[in-house]
């Protein structure tokens, strides 16, 4: 029966193959578990080939459940994992796909390697791994795995060499090895034609990619011919409604778009939409389907993006104003459907890595949407369209952080059981910890592959357990998933309602890709009563100057006055001067994007120094004009769950690094810390943990308190993945923790703090992701629930840090907003410093991230003090009047 199934499946008769396998499951006789597992796995393969990926994954899950994890079944289990990885690859959830494949490879390598079926499965796993790395644009890793697959197949006379040849061809094409690419495409085509004939279903896959290669070589007629052949095969094998048919129509549309035949391209894109969406058959290019009934969301997303761009180009050709307006409107509607689909896809991803990958790779989609909305606004002047620009920009930025904050709020709600939440957090922490172990071991000169494999196996099991917990939460608390689906940034009116009249939000959206040497920049300016935006173009000089500024702050020893101040003035001219007249009041809230996140705005120069000036004294920094704070996205500024945080008590932690601890490091003691803490408690009450008491264990206990946290300590940054950056505590008397509080551990915590001060620890640096911003320790505390974080963007001088922090707490104690307090502290420092120390390197590192509202004082205590003073004054007055009366009576 299984042999018959294999023959039918190989021939492309998927309906016949399905009918062949169903009797195994319908049998009333007792069927062995391995037969049931094989039947479910084969049904999954059929559904995957038919483009029904959700059904396929369900069958693979059932196959796994019927396959016990014993040695005789390991081969079957690995085969199921291989198939599951393909589903996750189609969905572009690459980190999960890689995990399944690596698990399968480890299983194959543990078995009898001379078995031809195992060798074939191993070669397929390497092939699939190569495909994933190709999709991730990691072409060197793709070639490494594809060549492993090819060697196994050729050396052992294994089947399906044509698929490996195809993917080698694609990868060589991307690495400019065009002759090799052509050779492998030809080998793949010839192998399939020879073995199966010219209408074999897998031949379409080769024609897809060969056509793309031909088009990139400007061989347009040949590309059109290849894609037409692919369409013919797909229609024959799959019918009108199928993801591969949709892909065929899209490729043909792309071919006509490349030839500037926009009308024909749109016809093909419309047919592609019809093929990928159930219950949609409208050939009118001005009609769009519902995104809720697609066969495959990723395919629909690509189609909508292509159609929207073609509509814009088509509109540019039209002389009829009404038709032009209609076409631009439809382009905007189409790209908005794509954005809605991106949200749906993101919410269905299981891992943060997959969500970040989506954000990075779809950022240009959001930029195109803003561009189309801007074009429409210029044609109509419609205020509703201008407001839509704001909404699109908000969705384009920090979507992963926004989702995570909402998830945390929901997880800590009363509806989720404490045990379930604790189990999920524990698993998340263990997963991150094991990932860190693997990273650290891999960085060694001679990494232990056995230990790495052991940890990866443990990771695999933990991730599957976490998935089950997520399913349990969704099942027991359906509102959880529904609420996540409804996450929307705060509307413009809601932001303006909370803004004060002296506050202005300046929000940047910057393209991460160059287009003919240019990058698009959108600047949104939001005040209490108005909203405006500006569209501008940046060239390579912007990145060059931003890089020079960052380098000057990171390496002050090579700080050249002209090479430093020139970029500070240039960046001001690029980012703030174009919108200066739109700013209201003296408080700026900056929402950066891309490398703008590295720039300290209060150090930007309003005017370039004169040719004779050689020192920093008297320069016109933006600090003199504005109090500046920063945020990841505008909704976060007034996030209700963060605004309600209260706590005036300051809990400070200052380790003594004079002796080596269990962490194996000897760090210099932080000079000036004692004076810094004295200044804090001059204005605020609280408790100080210094030296041996500044342990990770004590901090974890203190995190449960509604207090301000002041952390005067070192941080160790991981330049590759900031999730593994950590704060360094004292370990001398800590028997429970290792003294390293990792960023991922902070993110999984729950804080009730109005402010976390990360003093002298380079806490604002991290990994920069397109669309998400900086992944830093500061971000970890925001995710944990802190209303605001006072952070540093580079290493700071301890004594100057103590001076600025002292001033900050003083002004904060008088009721000043955090951004005002920090500005006044910096101005006080500049006023009292020598010209040699007025360089921004010394004072500009500190920044306010998040809500800058004043810290709430203990009004009950203050009230009692005032009442006591009045009481004392009253007693003194009574005594004075009584003595005066007695004295008067004596005179009488």
Model-found features: residue ranges?
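Caspase-like cysteine protease fold
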Residues: 389-391, 399, 717, 724-726, ...
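Catalytic cores of nucleophile-dependent amide-cleaving enzymes
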Residues: 632-634, 639, 707-803, 876
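Eukaryotic all-alpha helical interaction scaffolds
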Residues: 9, 21, 25-28, 47, ...
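Tetratricopeptide repeat
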Residues: 17, 23-24, 56, 62-63, ...
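Conserved alpha-helical positions within TPR/SEL1-like repeat arrays
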Residues: 2-10, 35-49, 75-90, 117-135, ...
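Catalytic-core domains of enzymes
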Residues: 408, 485-488, 529-534, 545-552, ...
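Alpha-helical solenoid repeat scaffolds used for protein-protein interaction
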Residues: 159, 179, 183-190, 194-198, ...
């Amino acid at each position: 029966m299984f042999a018959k199934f294999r023959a039918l499946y190989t021939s492309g008769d998927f309906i016949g193959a399905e009918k062949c396998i169903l009797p195994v499951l319908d049998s009333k006789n007792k069927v062995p578990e391995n037969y049931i597992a094989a039947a479910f796995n084969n049904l999954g393969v059929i559904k995957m080939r038919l483009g029904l990926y959700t059904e396929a994954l369900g069958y693979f899950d059932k196959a796994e459940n019927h396959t016990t994890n014993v040695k005789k079944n390991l081969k079957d289990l690995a085969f199921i994992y291989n198939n599951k990885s393909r589903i996750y690859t189609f969905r572009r959830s690459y980190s999960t796909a890689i995990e399944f494949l690596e698990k399968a490879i480890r299983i194959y390598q543990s078995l009898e390697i001379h078995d031809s079926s195992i060798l074939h499965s191993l070669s397929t796993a390497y092939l699939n791994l190569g495909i994933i790395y190709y999709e991730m644009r990691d072409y060197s890793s793709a070639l490494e795995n594809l060549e492993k697959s090819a060697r196994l197949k050729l050396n052992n006379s294994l089947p399906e060499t044509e698929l490996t040849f195809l993917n080698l061809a694609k990868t060589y094409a991307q690495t400019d090895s065009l002759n090799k690419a052509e050779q492998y495409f030809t080998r793949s085509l010839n192998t399939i034609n020879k073995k199966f004939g010219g209408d074999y279903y897998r031949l379409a896959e080769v024609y897809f990619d060969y056509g793309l290669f031909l088009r990139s070589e400007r061989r347009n007629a040949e590309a059109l011919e290849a894609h037409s052949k692919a369409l013919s095969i797909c229609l024959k094998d799959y019918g009108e409604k199928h993801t591969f048919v949709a892909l065929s129509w899209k490729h043909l549309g792309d071919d006509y778009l490349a030839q500037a035949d926009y009308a024909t391209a749109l016809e093909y894109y419309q047919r592609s939409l019809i093929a990928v969406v159930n219950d949609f058959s409208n050939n009118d290019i001005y009609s769009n389907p519902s995104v809720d009934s697609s066969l495959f969301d990723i395919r629909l997303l690509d189609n909508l993006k292509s159609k929207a761009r073609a509509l814009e180009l088509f509109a540019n050709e039209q002389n009829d104003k009404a038709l032009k307006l209609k076409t631009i409107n439809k382009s905007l509607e189409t790209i908005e459907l794509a954005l809605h689909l991106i949200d749906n896809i993101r919410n269905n991803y299981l891992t943060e890595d997959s969500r970040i990958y989506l954000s990075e790779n779809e950022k240009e989609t959001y930029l195109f949407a803003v561009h189309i909305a801007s074009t429409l606004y210029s044609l109509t002047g419609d205020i509703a369209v201008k407001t839509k620009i704001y909404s699109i920009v908000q969705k384009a930025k920090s979507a992963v952080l926004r989702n995570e904050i909402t998830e945390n709020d929901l997880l800590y709600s009363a509806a989720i059981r404490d045990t379930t939440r604790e189990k999920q957090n524990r698993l998340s922490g263990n997963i991150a910890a094991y990932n860190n172990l693997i990273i650290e071991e891999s960085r060694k000169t001679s990494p232990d592959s056995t230990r790495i494999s052991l940890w990866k196996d443990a990771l695999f099991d933990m991730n599957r357990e976490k998935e089950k917990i997520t399913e349990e939460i969704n099942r027991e608390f359906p509102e959880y998933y529904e609420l996540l689906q409804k996450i929307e940034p705060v509307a413009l009116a809601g932001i303006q309602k909370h803004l004060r009249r002296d506050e202005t939000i300046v929000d940047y959206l910057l393209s991460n890709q160059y287009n003919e040497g240019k990058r698009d920049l959108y600047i949104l300016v939001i005040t209490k009563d108005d909203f405006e935006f500006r569209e501008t173009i940046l060239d390579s000089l912007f990145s060059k100057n931003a890089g020079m500024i960052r380098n000057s702050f990171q390496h002050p020893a090579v700080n050249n006055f002209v090479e430093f101040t020139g970029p500070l003035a240039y960046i001001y001219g690029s980012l703030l001067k174009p919108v200066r007249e739109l700013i209201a009041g003296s408080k700026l809230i900056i929402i950066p994007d891309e490398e703008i996140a590295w720039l300290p705005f209060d150090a930007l120069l309003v005017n370039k120094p004169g040719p004779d000036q050689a020192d920093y004294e008297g320069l016109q920094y933006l600090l003199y004009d504005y109090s500046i704070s920063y945020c990841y996205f505008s909704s976060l500024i007034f996030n209700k769950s963060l605004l309600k945080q209260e706590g005036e008590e300051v809990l400070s932690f200052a380790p003594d690094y004079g002796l080596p601890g269990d962490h194996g490091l000897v760090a210099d003691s932080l000079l000036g810390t004692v004076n810094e803490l004295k200044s804090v408690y001059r204005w605020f009450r609280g408790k100080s943990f210094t030296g041996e008491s500044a342990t990770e264990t004590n901090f974890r206990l203190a995190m449960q308190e509604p207090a301000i946290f002041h952390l005067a300590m070192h941080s160790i940054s991981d330049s590759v993945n900031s999730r593994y950056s950590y704060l360094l505590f004292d370990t001398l008397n800590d028997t429970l923790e290792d003294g390293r509080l990792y960023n991922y551990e902070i993110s999984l915590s729950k804080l009730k703090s109005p402010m976390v001060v990360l003093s002298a620890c380079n806490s604002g640096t991290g990994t920069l992701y397109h669309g998400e911003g900086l992944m830093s320790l500061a971000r970890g505390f925001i995710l944990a629930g802190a209303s605001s974080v006072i952070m540093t963007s580079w290493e700071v001088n301890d004594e100057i840090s103590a001076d600025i922090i002292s001033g900050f707490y003083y002004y904060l104690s008088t009721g000043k907003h955090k951004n005002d307090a920090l500005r006044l502290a910096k101005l006080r420092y500049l006023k009292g410093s020598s010209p040699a120390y007025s360089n921004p390197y010394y004072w500009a590192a500190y920044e306010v991230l998040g809500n800058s509202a004043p810290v709430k004082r203990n009004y009950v205590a203050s009230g009692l003090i005032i009442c006591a003073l009045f009481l004392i004054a009253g007693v003194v007055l009574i005594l004075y009047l009584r003595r005066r009366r007695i004295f008067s009576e004596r005179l009488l």
